Amino acid sequence: MKIGIIISSNDAETCWNALRYANFCLNQKDEVKVFFMGKGVEYQKVGTDKFNTVEQADKFLKSGGKIYACGTCIKAREQEGSEMCPISTMKDMYEIVKESDRVVTF
């Protein structure tokens, strides 16, 4: 199954749980793409020892998951894109939604 996950929260626990879910889906042999938008592009900065968002994202990428992030949202926060938060577009999000069998939002 193809699963799209859209994360627009910068709450550490919410981002952490969304990424844990993404990792769980990969372990079920699903194809998973995560798109960060709005406050969600801040996920690397909001992680804590208890809710380590970067660790979950790293595990996700190393397991074959794909991460996308709204370029406009990144620029609005004066951030730069990176491997863990690559600059993407609304067209990318559209394609994820269009191609996914299921879309989950956080």
Task: List the model feature ranges, each with a label.
Residues 50-76:
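A glycine-rich helix N-cap at a beta->alpha junction
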Residues 38-41, 74:
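Short beta-alpha junction loops
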Residues 14-27:
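Histidine-anchored nucleotide/phosphate-binding helix
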Residues 20, 49-54, 86-89:
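Charged helix-capping and loop-helix junction motifs
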